[in-house]
Amino acid sequence: MINKLDGKIAFDSFSLTPNITLQAFKSLLKSNQIVSHEENEMAINIYLLPQKCGDKYFSIRLYFSQKNKVLTHLLISLQKNASIPSWTSWSEKDQLEVKKANDSWLSEEIGDIPPYKFSWGEITSVYSQREGSSYIAIKYY
């Protein structure tokens, strides 16, 4: 899924590359895959329906620079199924399990010991108590 050499991330229905433009990204997927699209003066934030990669589902949030409309970073997180995560079913215990699953998946996928730093960017597994979520942050340089 993650190519360590060039930073390409492949899901079953589309692939992302460092510095992909917003226009190019939108041409890759159907509009019904977008759950939300928010903009502010700094970034364009797009949240997708969970996407499949092999036998796993990932929630995906992408951030594009408002200045040049280029992908700057994304957050992905393993999901148990294709349903959209909600606060009604949220628990800290579940989020800590997601963090553990994200860590395990990264170790299998990348194989190195964190921190994961590459010429194209860096990858970090995060549990944020303030945000109430666990995710894999991929930041492109």
Question: What are the residue ranges of the model-derived segments?
Answer:
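Short helix/turn-capping signatures at newly exposed starts of structured segments
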Residues: 1-141
